Amino acid sequence: MIQLDTSWLQHVQKPARYTGGEYNSIVKDHSTVDVTMALAFPDVYEVAMSHLGIKILYGLVNRREDAAAERVFAPWHDMEEEMRKRNIPLFSLETRTPIKDFDVLAFTLQYEMSFTNILNMLDLAGIPMYAKDRDMDFPLLVCGGPCAFNVEPIADFFDIVSLGESEEWGDEFIDLYKAEKAKGFPGGKEAFLRKVAQIPGTYCPALYDVEYTEQGDFKSITPRFEDVPAAVEKRIVEDVENVFYPTKPVVPFLDIVHDRAVLELFRGCTRGCRFCQAGMLYRPVREKTPERLLQIAKDTIANTGYNEISLMSLSSADYSKLPELVDMLMEEFKDKQVSVSLPSLRIDSFSIDIAKKVQQVRKSGLTFAPEAGTQRMRDVINKGVSEEDLLAACTNAFKSGWNTVKLYFMMGLPTETDEDLAGIADLAYKVLDLHRDITGKRNGSVTVSVSFFVPKTHSPYQWYGQQDVEEIHRKQRYLKSLINNRNISYHYHDGYTGYMEAAFARGDRRLSKVLVKAWEAGCKFDGWTEYFNYETWLKAFADCGLNPAYFARRTRDFDEPLPWDHLDCTVSKAFLKREWEQAVEANLTSDCRRGPCKGCNVCPELNTAIIDYKEGGRVEKVTFGLK
């Protein structure tokens, strides 16, 4: 066990990030289990502890008597300095065991700009970065999460990639690891990886060869062995009603980003917003019943003492039994001062009655996501809402006592013009004027938050070249010039960070050396604006003979091989191509939950179907797929 001396620990910011011992944390004797796993999140404690996936994995592994899971997060700059000064290796929170002593080190890949933190954590742990330099005496490096669907830029560092939902995969992997460990891993690491690759949803990068053309373009990724799959299909959990859910999560000692109980209403989203990678990755929609959700809420509140429950899914307002669920939750917790919160709401799903109910305990502002300022642009991205929808929702809200509205938009979308940007300002002014007309007061406020669009893999925009940073900055200045009212706040994201994010989102295996160069030059916590250094990143690319524009800004041909083609989210490329063509024509594609199947291919490929309780019972739809 690593000993932490309070004589120096008290001088770092928020020592509770590193002490462990939180309520509901689980401590096991490593000598009594067969498999030890460090669950890593490459960001600071407050961000990591807010992530539902970590909570699920922590409970999932620790419910087994033969396995132990502990947490490890990226130490903040001051703590890292102290650790390096005192030669303290990266350690787990539960038992302060050096990370290099675990059997498995499993990272959650949530955001491309956290990749340098992975390298920094490996260095602090004394673990070689490149998978080729590690034998079975080191922890096996495993990763999963949305970025795993193009893991190629960091594939050289990882041994195993879990694609899709991990509950069932995790048990299968631990069972195999336990059995092979007991036999002494006959045949060594490569033999073990070949066995792991037989688990559905598993990608082992070292078992594949990457080929490039003479011009330096990506050509192919092919397996080195006949028993290794050419493409890896994602895993899903069909029975979300009965799947494990963490009702006894660790309660942190300090405030975290999302410090509340979390209810996952359903998985997947079929709205089909064309900019949204998650909506494609996590199909099909699978709902939990209100009764199951109520029991989860009761157990979680009893086990944690939280006073807020957040209803979380990709589009929570689309939960088919939302009014019934809210009534059940409010009735259960009305005398316990436990509030219920909804994230940003789709305008067309908004019900003022629901909003009024969930804010009986604590009232806050309302958040909507029109995403674009004109109807043409909203149709291009398949948002499926109108200006009338937004103004109607705001009318109901203002009549019911709300004064504050936050609106989310994106900038840099395909086919976007200055007229579309002006529409953002117009909408903000219309909402503000609406508040004054309804209330007769001038105390209304509108927050306009605009992010820089980053094209992502496995979406209809995966072929689209990102707009130039200078053009984005011009657009940001232009929109700012149109907003001249102290009651309208305008926030926007840094364009340079989005540029690097796009490069790694659509990159290939050559980018691993860029990451190492950038890390060696001091890059880490790149998702934090105050620590992102654009010039250092440009130099890292140049030193490796690469250009970020090649990966981020280049529009790709439909028939061009893509570095992520072998990582199959089961939405067919034919469907994505059709959606791109529909976008160019500004044509809408309806939600298959409320209409006929659109042929995305997920349900027949996975032999599953949508699970929806809208009509009072379980609904499963027969579907087809575009090939």
Residue ranges, per PLM feature:
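Conserved SAM/AdoMet-binding glycine-rich loop
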Residues: L39-A40, M113, D299-K406, M410-T447, ...
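Helix-enriched interaction subdomains in cytosolic or periplasmic regions
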Residues: M1-P15, R64, P604
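N-terminal [4Fe-4S]-dependent radical SAM core
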Residues: S7-A38, Y45-E46, P205, E211-V262, ...
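Cysteine-cluster motifs in flexible loop/terminal segments that predominantly coordinate metals
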Residues: C276, R556-L626
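N-terminal pre-triad scaffold of radical SAM enzymes
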Residues: M37-D43, Y58-V61, V250-F275, I301, ...
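A glycine-rich phosphate-binding loop feature that marks nucleotide/adenosyl-phosphate handling sites
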Residues: F192-C204, L314-Y319, P343-F350, G412, ...
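Glycine-rich beta-alpha loop elements in corrinoid/cobalamin-binding modules
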Residues: A74-P223, P460-R509, V516-Y531
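Canonical Radical SAM [4Fe-4S] cluster-binding loop centered on the CxxxCxxC motif
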Residues: H51, D255-E291, G599-G616
